[in-house]
Amino acid sequence: MRSLPLLLLLLLSVTLPSGSVIADACIISSRAKGVEVELCQENRSIPRELFRSGYCQPQLVDQQVAVRFVASCPNGAFGICRNAQAANLAYRQDVHYYGVASDARFLRPACEQQPGARWESPQR
């Protein structure tokens, strides 16, 4: 009998009234001069509203940008910066990189310079 209220509470905590899942990640796609970039930011400790309205809304000059909110980042990333520090604050996120795997030679060192962050190269 007690498990039903707990189940309902769990369901209410992860769904919106419309039935859609609360997003904990955002996929950002950008294009400039024929170059396409796609990454996914997965929230670890950023306040939800700040994550959605700030971190997932990049202001990139002369680029077409599309943002999609998802429950979690999809598989297929060539690299993931785990526990990345967000904007020199205590906030943390995991950043998944898709596209050109050779970009890891720049992204990995930048990731590893952040305190507590670590680079992962998932099996593709």
PLM regions and their residue ranges:
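Mitochondrial intermembrane space
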Residues: S20-R124
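N-terminal secretory signal peptides that target proteins for export/translocation
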Residues: M1-R2
